[in-house]
Regions:
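A short, conserved structural fragment
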Residues: 49-59
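Conserved hydrophobic residue
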Residues: 20-21, 54
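Short acidic, hydrophobic short linear motifs in intrinsically disordered regions
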Residues: 21-30
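Basic amphipathic alpha-helical segments that dock to polyanions
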Residues: 43-49
C-alpha cells in the first residue's frame, strides 16, 4: 500500500478525478482547489512521479496507481 501525506493525497485526487490532464490545467486546478503556486504543483508532481504514483508524459499527467491502492497517511494513523 502506498502512503501519501494529506497534501499529496489531495493533489493526487485532482489527477484521479480529471485524468488524463494537461499539466497546465493541473496547475490551474491546484491553484483553485489547493491554493498552490505553479512551483509547488510541479514540485509535488515530480515527487509523486519519482515514487511511481503519477506520470507526466508529454505534458499530460496520468496516474500509475489506482486511488484504491493509495492510503492517506492521516487516515492510516
Amino acid at each position: 500500500m502506498n502512503h501519501l501525506a494529506e497534501a499529496e493525497y489531495r493533489f493526487a485526487c485532482l489527477v484521479w478525478d480529471n485524468e488524463p490532464l494537461p499539466s497546465g490545467q493541473l496547475v490551474k486546478l491546484s491553484a483553485a482547489e489547493l491554493g498552490w503556486k505553479k512551483s509547488t504543483t510541479y514540485t509535488v508532481l515530480k515527487k509523486l512521479c519519482e515514487r511511481g504514483i503519477l506520470q507526466n508524459e508529454g505534458g499530460t499527467v496520468t496516474s500509475l496507481v489506482k486511488k484504491e491502492e493509495v492510503q492517506c497517511a492521516e487516515s492510516a494513523a
